[in-house]
Amino acid sequence: MFIGAAAASSPQVLIGRAQAQMASELPLPVGPLANIPDVEHKTLTAGAIDGVDDEVFAPPGFDVRCVAREGLNPLTGESAPFGYEWHLDPDGGAVYPAADDGGWVYVSNSEDTPGGVGALRFDADGNLIDAYSILEDTRNNCAGGQTPWGTWLSCEETTGGQVHECDPFGSDATAVRKPALGSFPHEAVAIDPIHHACYMTEDGGNQRFWRFVSDESDLSDDNGVTRMGLESGTLQVLSIQGFEDGGYPEAADARSPQPVTWETVDIDTSGRVLFPTFQNDETTQGTRFAGGEGIWYYEIPEALRQTPAGGSVPTRGVMFFATKGDNRVWAYDIENQLIEIIYDNDNMQMETGFDQVDNVVVSPSGDVLVAEDGALMRLVVVVPNGQAKLLMQITKGGSEITGPAFTPDGSRLYFSSQRGPSGADGSGTGGATFEITIPEEYRTAPVASTPDGETPDTDRPPTGSAGALTAATVAGAGIAALANRALRPADE
């Protein structure tokens, strides 16, 4: 959702040093993008747009091109009133590898009414070879989430919003609505493939952090990957200890890992939640979050796993998510059921703090990236409990950065300017989609010689609503399944 509209005239800086951190923090590794140099002025290598070509900043060696503009056919760059045109207000996105030629597909939501999802098909050399729709006639498709079995979950951010499962290589005819995931203003989702759970953020001012846990009957085998049907299971909300029943934690309350529990929520047959989350009193359930935004699952490499203070096993799977109303980035340690704020403006000394954090993505090498909803229009690398780094900024303002997603090898990053210049002459404000190339030296994952402790036993049984879930497949199998499917600028 776009809120800020004031134009930014020059790159805004994320500088300074972090204040003293709490002694107890989740042991989260840092990826190579934490070491990027300062940004510099960029000229688009393809798809130059008047009014934007001189407003893009990224580090040296990171090339930027425009790959699609609203109202134009992405292949021809021309209007196609009787053919396919790139959609209005591009938002959340993801990338899927193609097995037949080594290429990939980037999918992008349309946060409009009617909304939907568009797809851009690239070959192995990064050439755009096709563009098409995979979901139509929905409402305000904001963000969503990628599944390990190769589908895209598109979220409607509206009252009574639903989640729709789409095939990136298919069409609108193959999309399926999933009411069991609840009917509320969905923002984004992420799948925990180890424990068969779908985590969800809810947009708004006083919302909840959700998960759907599949029953055994909801699971099936899909080319060696356990697939969640997302139709039979339990819907739950998270409660941070001491902040149950609509409680709201201040930043200082969660800068070190805090224990959580999960409370089951009842829904009707249409997915409507049978309690109003906006009533934050004793009738509600769960901890209150200030506007849930992007979310992404990351599995820490085995050699880098460590046991956190307050935990019993090494941290393995982590859900990173953002809350816009208070500009926080959170990390939830699934195995240890601990949650922590890993970034917030109040705890970091910077000249220009986060401006409405929104979409979240984690690179294949473990870098956590956040896109901003506000007018500063930045893509920022979040260093857990450390200093953020500016990766990209479009200083034109009047829009927001959306849909960041990496190719599986981490060599390319896609994103959109939701209200960026559109149309043949760039005079429109319907949105544009871009690609950044990532140099190889910033794609190498961190390594460690020995892990701290044993890999957690994912076959242990649940221990109540707050306990571990049933065992499943490893996250790496999901990537194989996808492949099997047809801040400071340098002086100018």
Predicted region positions:
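Perimembrane helix-loop junctions in membrane proteins
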Residues: G16, R488-P489
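Extracellular Ser/Thr-rich, low-complexity/disordered mucin-like segments
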Residues: D452-L469
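Sequence/structural signature of beta-propeller domains
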Residues: G4-A5, P11-D457
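Glycine-rich phosphate-binding loop of nucleotide-binding enzymes
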Residues: M1
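A cross-kingdom C-terminal cell-surface attachment/processing module
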Residues: G467-R488
